Structure formats: C-alpha cells, structure tokens
C-alpha cells in the first residue's frame, strides 16, 4: 500500500534574484490542500527595501511600485506561519 500525502501547503516565492545572501523575497504565495482538494490560499507582496532589478520585473511582473507599501518580511512571514499551521510544506 502506498501512503499519499493529501494534506499539504504548496509554497511559491518570488525574489529579487537567486542569491540567498544578497537577494530578497518580494512575493509569497501558498495554496492549502486538504484531502487533495484546494481549500485556501495566502498571497502577499513583500517590501524588499531594495530596488527590484529590471530583469526580475520582466520575469515576475513585479516592480518597485507594487511592493513599496507592502509589509516587510517579518510581518509577511508571521502571516505565512499562521496560514501554514502544522501542515507539511511543498515548495
């Protein structure tokens, strides 16, 4: 018998680049599945407090004006953690 995980959260992040040291998260998206059925979602922009490079705007469609009044990462992560609860995360 194969065990299938049917309760989980799928997580997606958009960032200002690929360097974990130098780049920042600019958007968090998550979708909750219960019994394999989509039941809820979470999304927020994150103010990276740095300029979003033009190439990243081309890829993501997210520009400085879209994040300038967004939450900072600590507040955004607190909201994400509340959303996640104790669910397994796939990303």
Annotate each PLM feature.
Residues 1-91:
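Conserved non-catalytic scaffold segment of RNase H-like nuclease domains
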